[in-house]
Amino acid sequence: IAAVIVTCNRIELLKRALKSVKEQSRQPNFVYVISNSTADNFLKEQKLCADFGFQILKNYRTENYAGALNTAVEQIITESGISNDLYFASLDDDDEWLPNYLQEIENNNSDNFDLLAGNLLRSSNTENNLLALPNELSEKDFLIGNPGISGSNTFIKLITLLKSGAFDEGLSATIDRDFLVRVFLQKPKYKIVNKHLVTQHTDNDRERVTTNRTKKEESLRVFFYKYQYLMNKVEKEQFFQRIEKLFSISK
């Protein structure tokens, strides 16, 4: 298991995320922290990662979230090659894994699944909402919205990730959904673990990619142009109704 944490100028939040990796009852075999931060903050992150015993790299691809994830993918392949039992487990710097996350996922991986996902708890001052994933998913679920898989509860076989085309660096938001559409088009063997294993912190008093309207609008337009061929008329309407309701973005 390779754990991957992408960070961008959020030292205090990163510390919480790294602590949640360090406290895993089943430790990852490799940990990669990839930084999109300023030079000053990168120095602070290096010190923090050294305290945890984790390696940190500067994102050397496109300077966004997808570029950082792909930097990690390249690094994993360089150091470990590609094998059928190597898994990629990502965590956003503002989220945290429960201490039993990796152990629970591994315990449920009885059939060498391509993808496993546990439930997210969305947590902030204004919400405490457990997103229960349906037991069956397809690419259709990610065309309209997101039923509850994010960067922080994605546990995927490296080979499946590569077959799906890795992460689209042309997008600055909607990266998880875009990736999962392509993953589910592969008809992967997957398992939903119906337990709360990851806490997704959704505080609105700081900028998150999800709340940056310009990035979101631009990425949703690209997403629609990429995948409209998979949507029927009703699904297209649902897509636009959702973005109007959630982000006030009009057709």
Region spans (language model):
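Short beta-strand-to-loop acidic/aromatic patch adjacent to the donor-nucleotide binding site
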Residues: S83-E96
